[in-house]
């Protein structure tokens, strides 16, 4: 088509297509690319979810398999050693900051045969029946907090006895009549309820898991130690010492003994059980668990490659164990998202079953009433979650300093009257 001036004019629809066509095509191309990319991302979500859930359940399964091996085979037939050393051969050292009334109750509970009694404190206090030593502010060493107090005592106190019995400020010695013959003697614990029922149930749950301690004397390296009730041959304590920065002094000491090529670790678990206080609040318990796992991870370098791997797997399984109850229901609500779904369901249910097993074993260890046992079993998902939250926090954001788990006044703690028998 031409105009009066002789110029050619394009049809209107042709002009419209030529002026907007390229931009429309570009827009459609970009939209198609975005949709394709979104589809690819969405397609990978089930794979990532499946891989994550399988990783968690396999970590838990490996940890449970090793625990089962320890309890069913290594600890099988273990007999608690009989005492061979009189209590007159023992020097007691209580570690505290400033909990005078709590320490006094613990000192009062000591057997009369133990006469060499010392309290290592951060603040001045008066304790009847024991000599109090205050760690000077000017004392410097690599160790911090409790470890610093232990190291000061090692350097400045004289011990003429065969054994040093280390106790926490709230450790109540209830049935001690002697010390078995070993370089390191681990006593068992029985936390008493203080303010919180949930933290108490979490302690019962934890002690159900810790029946594995019966296997520790057969291992090259005990997997952990409890410093609230541990007797160490004085000569060994003076040789190894406590001068190292750590948040788990007791476990680090035992691992250091095992790592010392000049020492053949002689470790045993005694029958005697000492009462302690369960953490008074959930927050205190979470902080406590966080220090345990962070300290364990930090000190793995003392272990051989095998035990380092075992410790890491167990710590990871503990930290991610809050997800275990969820694992059992994911396939039901989100079917088809997990590879090998039937195998996953079977394994996740088996893992959760062991969580119940630890609750039952804890009730048996404590000799608790039927009502408390039923309450713990019913509340096991919540209790195991609270028990592990601190481990998860300590693994993700390790604490950088040691914080003391505060104790409550003795009158707020359940009575310790009980009969102790073997488990």
Name each model feature, range by range.
Residues 1-34, 57-90, 116-124, 305, ...:
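Juxtamembrane C-terminal module of membrane proteins
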Residues 108-141:
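Acidic donor-binding segment of Leloir-type glycosyltransferases
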